[in-house]
Swiss-Prot record:
Family recorded in the similarity comment: Belongs to the virB3 family.
Origin: domain of life: Bacteria
GO process annotations (BP): protein secretion by the type IV secretion system
UniProt keyword list: Crown gall tumor, Membrane, Plasmid, Transmembrane, Transmembrane helix
Keyword Membrane: yes
GO cellular component: membrane; type IV secretion system complex
Chain's gene name: virB3
One Pfam short name: VirB3
Membrane topology, from the record: Single-pass membrane protein
Protein name stated in the entry: Protein virB3
Amino acid sequence: MNDRLEEATLYLAATRPALFLGVPLTLAGLLVMFAGFVIVIVQNPLYEVVLVPLWFGARLVVERDYNAASVVLLFLQTAGRSVDGLIWGGASVSPNPIKVPARGRGMA
């Protein structure tokens, strides 16, 4: 019962997502696809200048937390889709309602 646990070093690079010019690949792919849609729809490449502040804003967010883009995308896939959140209470980690309605839950 005196077995010692082995220690293994976990490097920071093993926990980070892959970055492209300081932005995670998933977010970079979305921004590049959005740039393509802008060129196709507007047919003027000067509107691509709008994406430069978005790119640098994404870099600023990712400087603080490498997984921030993944957290936002996960939110959009779960709670962002609940358009009837006011009626049913939305997506929550807790099974209990956060705030109880004035008329009670489930009573007409």
